[in-house]
Amino acid sequence: MSEGILFIISAPSGTGKSSLIQGLLKSKTLYNTRVSISHTTRIIRPGELHGKHYYFISKKEFEIMIKQEYFLEYAKVFSNYYGTSRKYIEKMLFSGIDVFLDIDWQGAKQIKCKMPKSKSIFLLPPSKDTLYKRLRERGQDSDSVIANRMEKAVDEMQHYSEYDYLIINDDFKQAVNDLITIITAEHLCLFHQKNKHNLLISNLLKC
């Protein structure tokens, strides 16, 4: 059995990253895909569940886990910690399951250094106006928080060229199809095909 592929997906807040990942999970793909559940110290939002969307823990707990080297990567965003469990990722990949990591560019850089075979995807909005509108429609943040998120979004988007793939989330269905295409392409690359069909290839090449 071949190992799963680790996919990193990053985007500014409000770009539709979470919706895109959920759209992928609901689609009929040929591959077993999971989303890594991160640990965070931020306050739980309405509709979120512990253990489903995030593992919500205290700052003290998070900092103890950092010292124990529990995280494959971690970062501080808007005064809150976010981190990815090393054991969870390794277990899923070894079981042949593709894993999606929803992390920012800082975390992506850490993962790329530690797991160079991982593939990274950056998601962009079709325009700044659209991004602003999406943030407003959430109805969760004040004007000052939205202004801060817009400013941070511009900074985050500067890093798009550090990624392997780029998706523009203008049309949702097309964006989901683009994501599925990326997954399919990676599974068809020589490295994964060779591992998956090693016995078949060996028999074909016998004299």
From Swiss-Prot:
Gene3D superfamilies: Guanylate Kinase phosphate binding domain, P-loop containing nucleotide triphosphate hydrolases. SMART domains: GuKc. Pfam families: Guanylate_kin. Keywords: ATP-binding, Cytoplasm, Kinase, Nucleotide-binding, Transferase. ATP binds at residues 11-18. GO terms for molecular function: ATP binding; guanylate kinase activity. It catalyses: GMP + ATP = GDP + ADP. It is found in: Cytoplasm. One of its GO terms (cellular component) is cytosol. Its EC number is 2.7.4.8. Residues 4-184 form the Guanylate kinase-like domain. It comes from the Bacteria. Belongs to the guanylate kinase family. PANTHER family: GUANYLATE KINASE, GUANYLATE KINASE-RELATED. Essential for recycling GMP and indirectly, cGMP. This is Guanylate kinase. It comes from Buchnera aphidicola subsp. Acyrthosiphon pisum (strain APS). The lineage of its organism: Bacteria, Pseudomonadati, Pseudomonadota, Gammaproteobacteria, Enterobacterales.
